[in-house]
Amino acid sequence: MTLLSVKNLNITYKNKEKEVYAVDDISFDMESGDSLGIVGESGSGKSTLAMGILRLLSPKTAQISGNAFFKENDLLAMSKDEFNKLRWKHISVVFQKSMNTLSPIHKIGDQLEDIYKVHEPKATKEQIKGRVL
């Protein structure tokens, strides 16, 4: 089963002066267990691609077209509430500058535990530990 399917994804940044085509017609499919490496020069759109799929770009500055499906879910068309049920539970990303996201003074397990508790507030400590370690 295809886990993530991205088809003809385009992301354009707009300002008053010009448009910048950051992601141009990208397509790929990923199955369960697949790994994907995205390689390119600084500023070539790698982070923009991930941020677009995860809907982390402001619609005021970025225009997204194309399709991104997680299983049967159209990531770019679903409501914000529906998407938030998937984010960090079923689909996530660790960006290249993870020090901006993850705290170096806290254990990674504790940080992942916090995210897990948001999605599974009734989970026991044992269940949480089994999931994050």
Locations of regions flagged by a protein language model:
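ABC transporter nucleotide-binding domains
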Residues: M1-L133
